[in-house]
């Protein structure tokens, strides 16, 4: 296949992904009320939601619909990336490429579900009722701030749950190994808590709730790296030396 044909195929696949995204956004707008209901269900017992600006409620509908459109488009985009790259891949590479995309999508969904079912309800409850006293203070929040917090946590946990997959890929490529991960685990834990402090509300409980799963996934990644890491064999070294001699 010449470059012109490849570019034409790539353009057609990008157009398909764009059409799927637009359709996903339009359809999601019709169900925006239900999507907002799903998000607010986690904090409805602890917060009273208000719309401060005239356009605030409408903008959240668009924001949630766009995110839903992205979610619908991602599997389609993954398929077209695989289909476009498949002719240039070996059979083993094609299988590994396909498994990486499927596992990556599954892990991201697990991370979002983990945040929605476990982390966010606990975090919202603590932020609302974690401090005793001042019962006369009514807890309210703008719908924009609430949606921003929810979507941020979903994206963070979705990405965090990709850590084992990234470790597997880098270990198979020989870029990292379990020994290296063990040596830098102290620094990694400090970085994890720093990141958690930046992306979470300013309280120690929220920080630990985000950092805890990240630290656990880091140690799981060390274990997986030990399974998938393959050090360079002597045969490969000899082949490299022969190529250098030539």
Residue ranges and their predicted role:
Residues 4-246:
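Membrane topogenic/interface segments and analogous intrinsically disordered interaction regions
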């Amino acid at each position: 296949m010449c470059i012109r044909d490849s570019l034409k195929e790539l353009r057609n696949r990008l157009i398909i992904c764009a059409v799927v995204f637009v359709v996903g956004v339009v359809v999601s707008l019709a169900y925006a009320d239900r999507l907002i209901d799903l998000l607010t269900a986690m904090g409805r017992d602890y917060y009273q939601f208000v719309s401060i600006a005239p356009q605030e409620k409408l903008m959240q509908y668009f924001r949630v619909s766009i995110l839903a459109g992205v979610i619908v488009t991602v599997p389609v985009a993954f398929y077209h990336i695989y289909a476009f790259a498949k002719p240039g891949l070996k059979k083993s590479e094609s299988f590994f490429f396909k498994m990486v995309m499927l596992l990556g999508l599954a892990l991201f969904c697990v991370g979002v579900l983990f945040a929605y079912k476990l982390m966010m309800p606990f975090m919202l409850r603590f932020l609302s009722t974690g401090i005793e006293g001042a019962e006369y203070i009514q807890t309210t929040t703008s719908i924009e701030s609430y949606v921003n917090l929810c979507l941020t946590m979903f994206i963070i946990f979705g990405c965090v749950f990709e850590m084992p997959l990234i470790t597997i890929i880098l270990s198979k490529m020989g870029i990292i190994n379990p020994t290296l991960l063990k040596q830098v685990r102290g620094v990694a834990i400090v970085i994890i808590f720093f990141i958690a402090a930046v992306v979470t509300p300013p309280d120690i409980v929220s920080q630990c709730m985000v950092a805890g799963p990240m630290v656990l996934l880091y140690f799981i990644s060390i274990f997986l790296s030990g399974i998938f890491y393959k050090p360079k064999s002597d045969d490969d070294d000899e082949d490299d030396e022969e190529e250098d001699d030539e």
